C-alpha cells in the first residue's frame, strides 16, 4: 500500500448526535485504495501539523450498490465536463478489465 497524491479534493464528515467531525483533503494530501478478500478500503491522509487520516472499508456488495447509485445519479444530471468525464471513463474501464475472468495459469 503506497500513498498517491490527491489530484482534486475530498471532504469527509461524520455526524454523531452530539458532535460532528469534518475533514478536508486537498492537493497537499494523499490517498491509498486497496482491495482484500472481502472488501475495498480508501484511506485519505493529510500530513503536517494538522494531520488527519480517514479510512473507509466497504464490502463488495455495498460497493456494487454504491456504484449503481452513482451511475443513476450521474445519468440524471447534466453531463459532466469533458475532463471529469474522461477521467471517470478511463477509471471505470480499468475497473471493468480488472474484474474480467482470469485463466488459472
Residue spans of the language-model regions?
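Positively charged, low-complexity terminal tracts
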Residues: 1-105
Amino acid at each position: 500500500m503506497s500513498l498517491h497524491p490527491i489530484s482534486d479534493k475530498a471532504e469527509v464528515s461524520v455526524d454523531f448526535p452530539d458532535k460532528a467531525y469534518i475533514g478536508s483533503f486537498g492537493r497537499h494530501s494523499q490517498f491509498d485504495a486497496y482491495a482484500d478478500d472481502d472488501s475495498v478500503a480508501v484511506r485519505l491522509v493529510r500530513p503536517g501539523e494538522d494531520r488527519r487520516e480517514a479510512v473507509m472499508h466497504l464490502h463488495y456488495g455495498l460497493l456494487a450498490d454504491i456504484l449503481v447509485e452513482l451511475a443513476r445519479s450521474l445519468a440524471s444530471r447534466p453531463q459532466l465536463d469533458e475532463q471529469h468525464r474522461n477521467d471517470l471513463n478511463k477509471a471505470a474501464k480499468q475497473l471493468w478489465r480488472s474484474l474480467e475472468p482470469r485463466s488459472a495459469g
